[in-house]
Amino acid sequence: MLVGLLAGGLGTNAKAQAFQELLEQGSAGLQVLALDSERGLRENSLLNPGNRIARLPAGQTEVEGRLDLKLATDTFEVSLKPRARFEWRRFGETGPETRLDAWVNQGLVTLYPVQSLAVSLGRDVLMWGPSNFRSPSNPIYFENGRNNPMRELRGVDVAQATWSPTQALSLSLLHQFGDGRGDWQWEKEDGFKALSLMKVDYTAEASVVGLNASKRWTHARPRFGAFGQTTIGEALLLYAEGGLRQGTSALYPERLPNAVGGAFLPRHARDHRLIYSALAGGGYTLDSGHTVYLEYLSNNEGYRWADGARYFDIASSAASVLATPSPDAALAGQTLGAALNNGLALLGRHYLFLQVQNNPTDTGPTWQLRYALNLVDGSGQASAYAEWNIWSRLALFAVGVMHHGGNRTEFHSLLSQSILVGAKGYVL
């Protein structure tokens, strides 16, 4: 009996020791952010007269908690990133609103059945490509989130398998079955459509190339994407990125004999027109360690000059109808809502982008300057970001944005300027 008790005790101790060793392979981090933002709304906006359509808050105070948990072994990896945010939104004369959100931004289980294979299931942020302005090769994240380092991209629900037969070559198959905002469905009322994607990546000594093909599980046609980058010497980086498909469900302005002079309709939803977005750029690192990026984006899904003029003509008519009591006010509101939610990530066709940043490893503040110019309507957006580590576990940050152009231009149609200031602390 004594021998049995000793054996049981030794077994319990072994299990406890194994569990402790497993915990030592994990990590945990808790970050708390507190920030305040103020927006300068365009007073004579044609798209958002009196802020009645977009209902943008003039100011917003937020407190957000970001918990990061990870456990990694040779055979599996588990990560979980729950988030919670409290918002106090200020709308001027209509009074403030409060909101409390909690969600899982990322949560992934990855298995490694063999050394060259990884199989994962859960919620993840799927980013690739070298571009700073936009990511045209990515069918999920064209908006790559790099304009504001303080904001996280929302994860999407995916199942993924990646096979790497060599260190240079990898093949990935993935299926996106949810948008990361709740129910996992193939097709939702809010317009979500499941997506299947195949991606091939090849890494050489100084170059990276990636190709992908994807399809939404609807009548949408396949989409193709590609990116490539190469380093020349120690200072110069050159890259290109693009996406291609047939047709688009985006809304385009059409003249109609109604009270607002037109409507926004899916002009190219059923045709075989090739829709592309292509970016070419480069980065050069100066002797000081600062890096300068210059990019050009061509996007034929955007409006031609005539469509852009018609877009704001219809918006102007709708705004005039809303200015006075009218039986056509509902139509005017619906028209402006369609103008703001037309399915286009960018309104125009040709853009120039400049970014300058310091070396993040430098002592002192980290900073980044960005400027985007619509080459057709002449409007632009300039932004500056800075972050100061004032203590090992505390940092201050600020983001300022300025817009220029007329009220019939892309970048200056809703906002004139905005500023965000805050602090982030690491509790764990």
Stretches with model-predicted labels:
Residues G225, L237-Q357, L369-R370, E410-H412:
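Extracellular/periplasmic loop regions
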Residues V63, L69-Q176, G405:
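Outer membrane beta-barrel
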Residues L30-E38, L71-T75, A84-R90, R123-M127, ...:
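Transmembrane beta-strands of outer-membrane beta-barrel pores
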